[in-house]
Amino acid sequence: MNKYFLILIFSALPLTQFAAEVSGIVEDTTGEPLVGAEILWQGTGIGTVTDVDGFFTIETTDASNKLQISYLGYQTTIIVVDDPTETIVATLAAESEQLNDVTVTARAVGTVSSRITAVQTQKITGAELCKAACCNLSESFETNASVDVAYSDAATGAKQIKMLGLSGNYVQMLSENTPGIRGLASNYGMEYIPGAWMESIQVSKGTASVVNGYEATTGQINVEYLKPQTTSPIALNAMFNSELCAELNATGGWNINDRLSTGAMLQYRNESMEHDQNNDGFMDMPKGNRINLLNRWYYTDHDYTMQLLVRGLYDDRRGGQTQAWRQANADKTPYDIDIATTRIDGFLKNGYVFDHERGTSIGIIASGAYHRQNSLYGATNYDATQGNAYLNAMFQTYFDTESRHKLTAGLSFNYDFYDEHLATNRLAAGLFDQTRNEFTPGIFAEYDFKYDEKLSLLVGVRADWSNYYGLFCTPRFNIRYSPWTWWNLRASVGLGYRSPNVLTDNAAIFASNRQIVLTEERFAQERAINAGISTTFYIPLGSKELQLSADYYYTHFFECVVADMDSDPHSVIFSNLNDGRAYAGNFQAEASIEILRGWTMTLAYRMSDVKQTIGGQLREKPLTNRFKGLITTSYQTPLKKWQFDVTAQFNGGGRLPDPDTANPLWNSEFKWYPQLMAQITYYGKTWSIYVGAENMTNFKQQNPVIGSDNPFGADFDASMVWGPITGAKAYIGFRWALDRKD
């Protein structure tokens, strides 16, 4: 017995030698610790975050000897670790153009939850994005309980998000704090941001800062792209799945000199194979090609910084009835879906720091977008163009040298241009032509107060004027109170507004033959108040920490557009809420812990109660899950060579639009269903390979295309999707990155 014990002890010694740890402290230029700074071995998914004292410990790996240290609002730095026994002291300087500094912290590496900000915020890091195939933004929330992503119809492959039980139209989508996915882009824009391009994602619940506008009613999602100063000179990410979809991403960043750096990103996606798993004659997913290009520049000169980003995209989708159906029905007219999209967007940021001691700075952000979509859905043609121009000029300063009282104020201007043309026999007039030019100048001010780590307060107000809707005011209030280090309490309340775009907001109706009834020539501005409360407990369990959190958010609409699919099973009636009611209540509880070194687990459960007045009655909103359960677990071996990730989802049932009582073609409700995803990753020195599977339960919605045998008939409807359209899917991928030499 003793002999075997000694053999075990001595065989473990080499493992102990290789599992050396690097420790250090991350602080700002004033010496204050940065809580929640992300520490990552460059070119890998191996990382950690600093604790409440700015301290971190991370095990070494053969894959890299360069630590990438980043923190929201500060310049990312890279430190070469030659001697792991030396303690690192890293000092990060603030980025002058980044006026919204956000501090986040947690012990979980993948998803980092805020501890000391007033707004409830989660940061999905690069490590979390590597836990799944994550081909694009829409697939980045599989391990997140707060955000749902699902197909909006069974024919076009369009995906939309939901937060707090409501459509993603009420979530403000940002790209590096500039306008992102909105308007025409909301239907397919989630797929236009490749996972390999993203550095991190910040998810805020409830009404967020007024600095970025008035549109965040239920939350805000901000995407940070890879930065040219820190990303690898050349990195490749290739993926291939069992449905013969192939995707290649290439990224790179180069420092031209000490002041100027540039980065480039490329994506190509090809999906050329037809799939019809339920044999209804319709493709489960459209075929298509996508090319996506991005170029960005970063310039800094002492107190001045400038960023320029330009992106171009072309996406072509071809769906409808399969080739096999066409060959068997040569005498019939096939139902075709063809959607071609061209998009160009970008931004220019300028920032200048006048006084480093008080953080006095000015920032000017300009962005623009051009989006063109030409669509064919059977006998319906929908062609639309959107243009957007945005300008935000901000001034920021601290009232004191202790950085407790901060004021941010500024002016903004937003211009939206829409030109829509709809030709269909589903409109009473047969034709819909509308051009909209909306100008919205605004002014805002925001006060941010922090008292040690116990109290954070964010109070803001903005006033905007629209040439369509006149003057409107947006007050918002967020507070965090933490009397002890193990407990956080937050509360928020604020207003949110948006200008409705009835057709683009409900594009899934194009994949049906329901008659479209527009009760208004111009629909009222949507207005809502959102209030929420959340609490988090940090419970020490030996050397580990259990995080328990719970939150409840309530959204009440004063005005919104109602899509009535109940009054007539062959129509969709759009109307203002008027004197009706519409609200959404959302409760969520979550627990996360590192069970053993390298083994983490998260459990979450969410309940949603979403109702609105439909046809004169207050009813549950259709196609909305009543609950969601989530279990995620991740294990990384001691030498950081292997990583195993498993995610299980339990999606609650809900209500479907009322079927035709004389000829019911669908049920009045849908039941809950499970989904299971898993991935295994192996890390080499500068490369990694991953294999995984999605929807391993092979659950599929039965007959997602209603009336598929007669797609030009009145019963055809592919818009009532509540579950997966395709079954189990496997994939394999490869990541490679060249080490930076600077």
Language-model regions, residue ranges each:
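Extracytoplasmic beta-strand/coil segments of soluble accessory domains associated
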Residues: 59, 138-182
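N-terminal periplasmic accessory domains that precede
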Residues: 85-91, 137-140, 159-162, 174, ...
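Membrane-embedded beta-barrel scaffold of Gram-negative outer-membrane proteins
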Residues: 363-367, 371-375, 482, 488-490, ...
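Flexible loop and strand-edge segments within Gram-negative outer membrane beta-barrel domains
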Residues: 271-292, 300-362, 368-388
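Short, acidic, small-residue-rich periplasmic hinge/interaction motif at the N-terminus
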Residues: 27, 37-42, 68-75, 84-130, ...
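C-terminal beta-signal and adjacent terminal beta-strands/loops
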Residues: 4, 597, 650-657, 681-742
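Gram-negative outer-membrane beta-barrel transporters
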Residues: 450-454, 548, 552-556, 575-659, ...
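Short acidic/polar hinge/loop motifs at secondary-structure boundaries
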Residues: 56-59, 160, 178-205, 293
